[in-house]
Amino acid sequence: MDISEAKKISIVDYLENMGYTHAKMRRGQYWYRSPLREEKTPSFVVNNNLHEWYDFGIAEGGDLIELGKRMYNTNDIHTVLTMIERDS
């Protein structure tokens, strides 16, 4: 898998495959409890049309590659792509 292929993967589908379910959906945005930290109220939003996420609790966001870096705690793109391919 390369970066362009990874960026085509739906973040919503990816999170669902990882066992995360959205708490609500509003205006095409999917709200989750953050996969990056513990929280009670959903503040992690995914815009599936733009292939972007944003975590209001830590004021960070990006595409699936950036999410993979955070979830797998690495900046190594090869590792991130391998893990995304495995988990999607």
Feature-to-residue mapping (PLM):
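N-terminal structured subdomain of primase-like DNA metabolism proteins
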Residues: 1-88
